[in-house]
From Swiss-Prot:
Keywords: DNA damage, DNA repair, Host nucleus, Hydrolase
Gene (UniProt): 46
Physiological role: Excises uracil residues from the DNA which can arise as a result of misincorporation of dUMP residues by DNA polymerase or deamination of cytosines. Therefore may reduce deleterious uracil incorporation into the viral genome, particularly in terminally differentiated cells which lack DNA repair enzymes.
Catalyzed reactions: Hydrolyzes single-stranded DNA or mismatched double-stranded DNA and polynucleotides, releasing free uracil
Listed name of the protein: Uracil-DNA glycosylase
Annotated GO biological process: base-excision repair, AP site formation via deaminated base removal
Length: 252
């Protein structure tokens, strides 16, 4: 794969440069799991350097130190559920984990709907009054945006900055190396990633995006509405059937 990318997609990068994990902000277990060769490290380092330079002239979210925060919540071998988002919140609340915000920020509308759906599956669930999903992450729920940065108040502004190859690598490697994970794909951009997932080894759940806009939209779609999709209950049933500890969706 690397040789094909070198030849067809990217200009040649120097082989002799070696960037340690802290240079590319990625937790070491993920560096090893993704087989981050010097070539891949250089490519990721270049993207991060470009974004860091852009911060001198515009506001970018999340902060540089939080871009890879998703990689520090659980080891790759412990991932059980993958929730794929689009790009980070662009209003200052992004923290490097899809749909999540740090405590102290208002709960975004999409996350409010996610909490509604959890409560639909588990009536005892109580919305925590905050939007921090780190407790899910520590149990093996990977909250991954396909684009890892965004310019303030400009959604989708970093879609062409070089993140797609990296997040595609994460998704495909999880699919290839793990077994019996649940991939939750909400919205057309996330659903497009289903082509990278081995459906013989994993459960793929699809629905419309949890945003209120998608919920109100009456356009024709082959995907079920997010509210009422039952994904959180279905995921735990699947994990239990495959001798994995189900996710406790409770948030304190």
């Amino acid at each position: 794969m690397e040789e094909w990318l070198r030849k067809h997609m990217w200009p040649a990068l120097p082989d002799h440069q070696h960037h340690p994990s802290y240079d590319i902000l990625l937790a070491e277990p993920w560096v090893q799991f993704l087989d981050m060769t010097p070539f891949f490290r250089q490519k990721l380092y270049n993207t991060l350097s470009k974004i860091n330079e852009m911060r001198k002239s515009c506001i970018i979210y999340p902060p540089q130190a939080e871009i890879m925060s998703w990689s520090y919540l659980c080891a790759p071998e412990d991932v059980k559920v993958v929730i794929i988002g689009q790009d980070p919140y662009h209003g200052g609340q992004a923290n490097g984990q899809a749909f999540s915000v740090n405590k102290g920020f208002p709960v975004p509308p999409s996350l409010q709907n996610i909490f509604k759906e959890v409560r639909s599956c588990y009536p005892d669930f109580v919305s925590p009054g905050h939007g921090c999903l780190e407790e899910w992450g520590r149990q093996g729920v990977l909250l991954l945006n396909t684009i890892l940065t965004v310019e303030a108040k400009k959604p989708g502004s970093h879609s062409d900055l070089g993140w797609t190859w990296f997040t595609n690598l994460i998704i495909s490697t999880l699919s290839n190396k793990l077994n019996n994970c649940v991939f939750m794909l909400w919205g057309s951009k996330a659903i497009a990633k289903s082509l990278m997932i081995n459906k013989q080894r994993h459960l793929v759940l699809k629905a419309q995006h949890p945003s209120p806009l998608a919920a109100k939209n009456n356009y024709s779609s082959s995907q079920c509405k997010f509210l009422g999709c039952g994904h959180f209950l279905t995921a735990n049933k699947y994990l239990t059937q495959h001798n994995k500890v189900p996710i406790d969706w409770t948030l304190e």
